[in-house]
């Protein structure tokens, strides 16, 4: 009898979760709240020169590159105006970036370094799309694409609604995780496929648990002065788990692991193999 009573309590919640509840995944955070994010990216790459002798200390041995970037940022979201547009102030509280070559630290010009301590304003339209990002003139002069960077940092989500077990596909634009000569920015293009695994509750909020896979490629010419250009081909694949706060509309947690393979030709030919892990945590409160 006790088992029947327990089953009668649990079964309705299970059936409700399996009965087709649909949730909307919007890029725009809910109004009137403050969200804090912490993002950590770790990258490890082996680069091997082709047609070179191998052995201790020779040019044919892999060059091991390592990189780590940590970002802490605060987003203060205001109330929507009469047209439904909403603004959010984004402050980059702390940014650190480091790089090593064969274990030895080297200086790096991280693309996010100029953001340290800066404030930007993001604008969302009534449909929840990020339509504009404004920042100090110094950031514009640095060549950083503020809109693209913000979308990358806070998470891209499908704009469609999903029920448990359903999938949605969105286009993907991923910054290449290694510094390029002259500070040039390079991107991989592809797609991400999200699948809604379950919906849970934490207090008064619904938390969507999702898996997603990514597949992106890049084929690009890299100028090398008067000597012409190098051809770089890279493919990046991977997957992630994430928790999305449905009601406050922000990424509560995510853990993404990527693998990339690439080659460079047209000069000293080389191949590369690497891994990248990006972890994010988010928390929200009323202002």
Predicted regions and their residues:
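Positively charged n-region of N-terminal signal peptides that target proteins for export
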Residues: 1-5
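Signature of exported/secreted
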Residues: 18-287
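Hydrophobic h-region of N-terminal signal peptides that target proteins for export
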Residues: 7-17
């Amino acid at each position: 009898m006790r088992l029947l009573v327990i089953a009668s309590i649990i079964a309705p919640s299970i059936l409700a979760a399996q009965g087709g509840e649909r949730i909307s995944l919007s890029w725009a955070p809910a109004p009137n709240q403050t969200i804090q994010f912490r993002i950590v990216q770790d990258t490890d790459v082996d680069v091997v020169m082709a047609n070179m002798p191998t052995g201790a200390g020779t040019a044919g041995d892999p060059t091991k590159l390592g990189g780590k970037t940590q970002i802490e940022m605060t987003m203060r979201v205001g109330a929507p105006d009469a047209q439904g547009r909403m603004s959010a102030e984004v402050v980059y509280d702390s940014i650190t970036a480091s790089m090593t070559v064969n274990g030895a630290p080297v200086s790096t010009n991280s693309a996010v370094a100029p953001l340290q301590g800066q404030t930007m304003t993001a604008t969302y339209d009534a449909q929840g799309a990020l339509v504009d990002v404004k920042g100090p003139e110094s950031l514009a002069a640095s060549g950083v694409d503020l809109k693209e960077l913000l979308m990358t940092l806070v998470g891209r989500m499908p704009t469609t609604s999903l029920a448990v077990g359903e999938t949605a596909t969105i286009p993907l634009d991923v910054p290449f995780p290694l510094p390029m000569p002259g500070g040039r920015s390079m991107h991989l293009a592809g797609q991400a496929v999200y699948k809604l695994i379950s919906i849970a509750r934490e207090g008064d909020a619904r938390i969507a648990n999702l898996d997603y896979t990514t597949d992106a490629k890049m084929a690009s010419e890299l100028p090398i002065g008067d000597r012409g250009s190098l051809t770089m081909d890279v493919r990046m694949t991977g997957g992630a788990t994430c928790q999305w706060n449905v009601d406050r509309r922000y990424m509560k947690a995510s853990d993404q692991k990527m693998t990339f393979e690439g080659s460079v030709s047209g000069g000293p030919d080389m191949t590369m193999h690497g891994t990248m892990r990006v972890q994010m945590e988010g928390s929200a409160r009323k202002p």
